[in-house]
Design a protein with these regions (language model features):
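A short, basic N-terminal segment
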Residues: 1-40, 341-343
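Walker A/P-loop nucleotide-binding motif
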Residues: 42-64
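AAA+/P-loop NTPase substrate/partner-engagement loops
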Residues: 68-97
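Conserved Walker B catalytic segment
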Residues: 107-171
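Conserved small helical "lid"/interfacial subdomain of P-loop NTPases
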Residues: 178-218, 228
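Winged-helix-like regulatory helical subdomains adjacent to P-loop NTPase cores
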Residues: 223, 237-299
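Short amphipathic alpha-helical interaction segments
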Residues: 293-310, 315
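Short, amphipathic alpha-helical interaction segments positioned at domain boundaries
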Residues: 327-343
């Protein structure tokens, strides 16, 4: 990866939010979003929620429909990297984006009618603790109060969504919930190759120059991407970078993706901890101690350090830890097998 031009790498792991048209690789979901946007503009009340697996492109999808289906100003309400369940941080997120002081209600009312509020990764505003639902409940109140005059588009990973809806009334706040489906082999091929072509580099696959690769060879290659990634486009994009063996004279030499041969996760404690990272996306050690209040801090720390050494978890910064994205499908499959996640 160090040999790759920065701009090429960013095409696959950076935030790709700029687009002059609706994306063309999620026709079913776009049709649902168009219908929902039409109803939202009729001021019937309610937000649009997009759910899916982590790395499945929820933020990209929401940014695309927010800019292409609505005419109002866009306000992106961003979470702290490791998340927060403190209402004061939620208020500050609105203040930073809108550039004013005041309560959330005052800030929303200061924006033009029909403004669009994008809230990515709602699971980062939530915690599986008794006090962890306060911001979720506040969001429900905000949507029910303001969605007649303003538009709200949210996204959340599907596993957190299933849990949160069991203990809150937040489903009542949504006009529609759109589930992002796994990508097909063809969708993965189109997405990866369109980004590759944008990067301006050529490639060699199995000693065959790019222009000489036939349809069957492309099909064989991307079937493997589909199988190993479980159709998760974010995982597939990272796999593409990982399978670049070398770069020479603006030419990429790529190999077939290979499924990582990982032993079964047999430690029950590891599985339980990993399930919390799937639900919350990323966590600090302090958050973990709140989620596991009956465990000694030293014991929780030992689990985390073991999972980092096993490369299942990675440090995102000094205090924030997350799942290794390359191993996400393997971890999801392991948790489903252990019945810690729904299939």
């Amino acid at each position: 990866l160090a040999q790759l031009p920065f701009y090429y790498r960013q095409l696959f792991v950076g935030n790709q939010f700029t687009s002059s048209s609706l994306i063309d690789n999620r026709n079913r979901e776009i049709a649902l979003a168009q219908d929902t946007a039409r109803r939202m503009k009729q001021k019937v009340g309610g937000a649009m929620l997009v759910i899916g697996e982590a790395y499945s492109g929820m933020s990209y999808f929401c940014e695309n429909i927010g800019t292409q289906l609505f005419d109002g100003s866009i306000y992106r309400i961003l979470t702290p990297l490791h998340g927060s369940v403190r209402p004061v941080d939620f208020v500050r997120a609105f203040q930073r984006q809108i550039g004013q002081k005041g309560s959330v209600s005052q800030l929303i009312e200061s924006t033009p009618f029909n403004s669009v509020f994008l809230l990515h990764d709602i699971e980062l505003w939530w915690e599986r603790t008794p006090q962890g639902y306060e911001i979720i409940n506040q969001l429900v109140d905000i949507i029910q109060r303001y969605s007649f005059d303003y538009h709200f588009i949210l996204n959340c990973n599907t596993h957190a969504f299933q849990l949160i809806k069991q203990v809150t009334d937040w489903e009542s706040a949504f006009l529609n919930t759109i589930q992002l489906s796994p990508f097909s082999e063809e969708q993965i091929r189109k997405t990866i190759l369109s980004r590759h072509y944008s990067g301006g580099l050529s490639l060699v696959y199995q000693d065959i120059p790019e222009k000489e690769i036939n349809a069957n060879e492309w099909e064989t290659l991307f079937k493997k991407y589909k199988l190993i990634s479980n159709g998760n486009i974010g995982v597939a994009l990272r796999m593409w970078l990982r399978n670049i063996e070398r770069v020479k004279n603006q030419i990429l030499y790529i190999k077939d993706p290979e499924e990582l041969q990982m032993p079964p996760i047999e430690e029950k404690e590891w599985l339980v901890v990993l399930s919390q990272f799937v639900l919350h996306k990323q966590l600090s050690f302090l958050q973990l101690t709140r989620i596991f209040p009956n465990e000694e801090k030293a014991r929780v720390n030992l689990w985390v350090q073991d999972l980092i050494r096993a490369n299942l978890l990675i440090r995102l910064n000094k205090i924030t830890i997350g799942i290794n994205p390359y191993l996400y499908p393997y971890i999801i499959n392991s948790l489903k097998k252990a019945q810690l996640l729904n299939s």
